[in-house]
Amino acid sequence: MNVENVLGQIVALPPDWHGAGSLKSGVLRAIARHAQGLDLRCTAETGSGKSSLLFSHLAKRHLVFAMDDGNGSVRRVQESPLLKPGVVEFIEGPTQKTVPAYAFAEPLQIVMLDGPHGYPFHHLEYYHFYPHLAAGGLLIVDDIDIPSIHDMYKFLKKDEMFELIEVAHTTAFFRRTAAPVFDPLADGWWLQGYNKRKKIVDWNPAAVAVALVPRPLRKALLKRLGR
């Protein structure tokens, strides 16, 4: 079955087909479009649904980190005739436990974050996935209209590891650049684009100088202020 054919069948599934909600057709089409030209040896997502069916036809191997939560959503995907056999590995359970415990054996060409949406769970998933995302691969972040996830979206837009290539409905698509992997075991907050300028929360002159003045000029200004 070719991708365009299966995509049409997936899009035609009713909106309530998946017990935990479904991606809009525009998002599914964007996934298929951005996957073109990529050698998808291994992809991964948190959450399951129509995207899982689509990835089973796009990738040689696909990892699904999800749990039913009593609504039968994972089983519905597993039993769908649109799921390509032998491609998808289901790692069931809370992603707060399953993602950190998983031993990734190869780079990932696409990662989609659509698991639990409460803070800090998206951020936890990102932390454990980003070192494994291959250069040129895709990071897909769903539900960026949720404030805490929108904060992640704003962070990623300024990070040198990622380039925003599309927002479809409330789903953001980032391409992994060739920038080095940010050390997941270090600090280096000052190296990250989102953190280049501190927020002003203390309005005394010295604090304003630290927040706004470039580091090379800061010492001289603080000296003039008598600090």
Show the residue positions of the predicted features.
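C-terminal end-of-chain micro-motif
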Residues: M1, G226-R227
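Class I SAM-dependent methyltransferase Rossmann-like catalytic core
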Residues: N2-L38
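S-adenosylmethionine/decaboxylated-SAM
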Residues: R29-G226
